[in-house]
Amino acid sequence: MATVKWADASEPQRGRQGRIPYSLYSPLLVDSEQPWKVIPRNLVPINKKDKNKLIGYWNVQKRFRTRKGKRVDLSPKLHFYYLGTGPHKDAKFRERVEGVVWVAVDGAKTEPTGYGVRRKNSEPEIPHFNQKLPNGVTVVEEPDSRAPSRSQSRSQSRGRGESKPQSRNPSSDRNHNSQDDIMKAVAAALKSLGFDKPQEKDKKSAKTGTPKPSRNQSPASSQTSAKSLARSQSSETKEQKHEMQKPRWKRQPNDDVTSNVTQCFGPRDLDHNFGSAGVVANGVKAKGYPQFAELVPSTAAMLFDSHIVSKESGNTVVLTFTTRVTVPKDHPHLGKFLEELNAFTREMQQHPLLNPSALEFNPSQTSPATAEPVRDEVSIETDIIDEVN
């Protein structure tokens, strides 16, 4: 017969010294590494009415969890036993025992109470006290994991075995519903961050993958599939074009001509001096974009490590963020990042300084325009890292 070892004893009681008796009450959870300094010396459950027997001890259960191969200590649990019961039933009151906190009310007799311990199949009682629990001490009110008997476990196992054939379809329905709930939660999270709702095409591909054409597929069904593919591609194009409808500070330029870096943020100049021709053409899909992004401040850094200035401009408010990033010289991505600074000024770079979607300029077909007055150019010194319009 297998031996079951419960974990509600102190460290010296672990191992092969027998099963630990069950406490009559639910344990206390103490948020301290030294519970004997927190528990009052008269903290005895008053569920029993005989004041002469309100005496006993709290047995400390040390707990820990392993995280990444390292032991992490958790808050200990304390289980109460009346004097003369429990794992230290032979110990005298106030005898020095490791992991034991002796408690008693005034007038209690220092002799065995005879109350015994909890039976295996019974539930623990919620302990009641005549005083308020100290800060950091709470009663664990969830059912004890050791309470269910072996017969109850067998009956539950038989019940699960008998209901297994009937639960196949509901289980698949639950899995399907859980997948839908996950997709809805992801879509809501993306929408709150400024992204658009994922397309149905993405949902179907995530669930079923890319369907393969059947041998018996009719030409009509093939045409239908081609139309569906064209519609999905058209929806992707609309999705990319939709970048221009977002606020300037929410755009994600990509490799599409209608929503690249130049369309979203204008051509490269002294105020927009990051990106070579290849990076500007591909935006967030550029080859080195993930490495570049590692050197860009996070949202929290922009909020809490920046100098933020607000200025009204008509019906809008301009927020100016000024921040700095200190990067070690041996950072693996710093070299590539620096190569992208002021890359548009190099002769080998061919940046589209003009709007690629603008009409071709033809002076012969245009009417003579009125000459605008010449105004003196005003030099403005800027120290703007990021603007939110």
UniProtKB/Swiss-Prot annotation:
UniProt cross-references to InterPro entries, sorted A to Z: N_prot_C_CoV, N_prot_N_CoV, NCAP_aCoV, Nucleocap_CoV, Nucleocapsid_C, Nucleocapsid_N
UniProt feature, compositional bias: Polar residues: 207-235
Domain CoV N NTD residue range list: 20-141
Compartmental location: Virion; Host endoplasmic reticulum-Golgi intermediate compartment; Host Golgi apparatus
Compositional bias per record (Acidic residues), positions renumbered to this chain: 379-389
Composition bias type Low complexity, residue spans: 146-158
One Pfam family it belongs to: CoV_nucleocap
Changes after translation: ADP-ribosylated. The ADP-ribosylation is retained in the virion during infection.
Cellular component annotations (GO), alphabetically ordered: host cell endoplasmic reticulum-Golgi intermediate compartment; host cell Golgi apparatus; ribonucleoprotein complex; viral nucleocapsid
Residues modified to Phosphoserine: 145
Composition bias, Basic and acidic residues: 159-178, 236-246
Span list, region Disordered: 111-178, 194-264, 363-389
Positions of the UniProt region annotated as Dimerization: 243-347
Domain CoV N CTD per the UniProt entry, residue ranges: 236-352
Chain residue ranges for the region called RNA-binding: 22-148
Main location: virion
GO molecular function: identical protein binding; RNA binding
Keyword set, alphabetical order: ADP-ribosylation, Host Golgi apparatus, Phosphoprotein, Ribonucleoprotein, RNA-binding, Transcription, Transcription regulation, Viral nucleoprotein, Virion
Subunit structure, as described in the record: Homooligomer. Both monomeric and oligomeric forms interact with RNA. Interacts with protein M. Interacts with NSP3; this interaction serves to tether the genome to the newly translated replicase-transcriptase complex at a very early stage of infection.
Family classification: Belongs to the alphacoronavirus nucleocapsid protein family.
Known function: Packages the positive strand viral genome RNA into a helical ribonucleocapsid (RNP) and plays a fundamental role during virion assembly through its interactions with the viral genome and membrane protein M. Plays an important role in enhancing the efficiency of subgenomic viral RNA transcription as well as viral replication.
Name under which the protein is recorded: Nucleoprotein
Organism: Human coronavirus 229E
Gene: N
